[in-house]
């Protein structure tokens, strides 16, 4: 199964770093948060990734084009015009980088990569700025079992997100503000049937608005409830928090060796 990751946003609340790189390339523990997200999927057997590039997308392309340089020790034999890579660290990934426009909204970016998932039974979809100790395989199994078009991961918020109205596992509506403590939110990790892309009109469509709301109204949106760790990296404070967890060896999303 393929995983589509949005990686084209500006990241204005992390402007100290995103002035020179896209938000998914902001580092946690010396590696881009995009890498952390891909490792989260990879540990569950996901090897095919489609990255929706936009703002400063060339930075992402350069990273993967020179992956050995970023991940390994190297010796440059200058007179021989040769590079020797030591202790190669390679991932079993197939990474497709797609330019989805500098100003496209989240739905527009997904629509632009439709050709890469159109023949699949289902695919995974997430944002390039959040991590969780999520059981990816369990979300896939849940999606296959209920037979609806879309599954989102419902989680508990740090405190500033709109809430979901979930009844018997089905998302009935979105609410601008939580009803109170205990309300779950859209955690941004999806399992989708390709047909949901038909609900996206154009580049200006926001995935979290019309498409998701329509799926909820049609009874085609189910919630996989994740009570564990979940944390987006929206602000510098979020980055510092995640960096601290990583440095202390207490990063809950690190389920790989």
Curated annotation (Swiss-Prot):
What does the entry list as the binding residues for Mg(2+)? 129, 234
Reactions accelerated catalytically: alpha-D-glucose 1-phosphate + CTP + H(+) = CDP-D-glucose + diphosphate
Task: Report the pathway entry.
Answer: Nucleotide-sugar biosynthesis; CDP-3,6-dideoxy-D-mannose biosynthesis; CDP-3,6-dideoxy-D-mannose from CTP and alpha-D-glucose 1-phosphate: step 1/5; Bacterial outer membrane biogenesis; LPS O-antigen biosynthesis
Annotated positions binding substrate: 6-13, 23, 104, 109, 128
Return the SUPFAM superfamilies for the record.
Nucleotide-diphospho-sugar transferases
Cofactor (UniProt): Mg(2+)
Supply the InterPro entries for this chain: G1P_cyt_trans, G1P_cyt_trans-like, NTP_transferase_dom, Nucleotide-diphossugar_trans
Q: Which domain of life is it from?
A: Bacteria
Q: How and how many cofactors are bound, per the record note?
A: Binds 1 Mg(2+) ion per subunit.
Question: Which keywords, in A-to-Z order, does the entry hold?
Answer: Lipopolysaccharide biosynthesis, Magnesium, Metal-binding, Nucleotide-binding, Nucleotidyltransferase, Transferase
Q: What else is known?
A: Catalysis proceeds via a sequential rather than a ping-pong bi-bi reaction mechanism.
State the protein's purpose: Involved in the biosynthesis of the tyvelose, a 3,6-dideoxyhexose found in the O-antigen of the surface lipopolysaccharides. It catalyzes the transfer of a CMP moiety from CTP to glucose 1-phosphate.
The record's subunit annotation is:
Homohexamer.
Q: Which family does it belong to?
A: Belongs to the glucose-1-phosphate cytidylyltransferase family.
What is the protein named?
Glucose-1-phosphate cytidylyltransferase
Q: Name its species.
A: Salmonella typhimurium (strain LT2 / SGSC1412 / ATCC 700720)
Its lineage opens with: Bacteria, Pseudomonadati, Pseudomonadota, Gammaproteobacteria, Enterobacterales
């Amino acid at each position: 199964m393929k995983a589509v990751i949005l990686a084209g946003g500006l990241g204005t609340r992390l402007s100290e770093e995103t002035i020179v790189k896209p938000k998914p390339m902001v580092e946690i523990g010396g590696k881009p948060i995009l890498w952390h997200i891909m490792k989260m999927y990879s540990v569950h057997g996901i090897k095919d990734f489609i990255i929706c590039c936009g703002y400063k997308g060339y930075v992402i392309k350069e990273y993967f084009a020179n992956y050995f340089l970023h991940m390994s020790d190297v010796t440059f034999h200058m007179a021989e015009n040769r590079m020797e890579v030591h202790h190669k660290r390679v991932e079993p990934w197939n990474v497709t980088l797609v330019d989805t426009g500098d100003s496209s909204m989240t739905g527009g970016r997904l629509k632009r990569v439709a050709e890469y998932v159109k023949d699949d039974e289902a695919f995974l979809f997430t944002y390039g700025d959040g991590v969780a100790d999520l059981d990816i395989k369990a979300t896939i199994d849940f999606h296959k079992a209920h037979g609806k078009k879309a599954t989102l991961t419902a989680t508990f918020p740090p405190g500033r997100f709109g809430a979901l109205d979930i009844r018997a596992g089905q998302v009935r509506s979105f609410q601008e503000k939580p009803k109170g403590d205990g309300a779950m939110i859209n955690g941004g990790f999806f399992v989708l049937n390709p047909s949901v892309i038909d609900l996206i009109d154009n580049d200006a469509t926001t995935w979290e608005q019309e498409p998701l709301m329509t799926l909820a109204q049609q009874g085609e949106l189910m919630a996989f409830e994740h009570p564990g760790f979940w944390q987006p990296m929206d602000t510098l404070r979020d980055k510092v928090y995640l960096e601290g967890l990583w440095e202390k060896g207490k990063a809950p999303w690190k389920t790989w060796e």
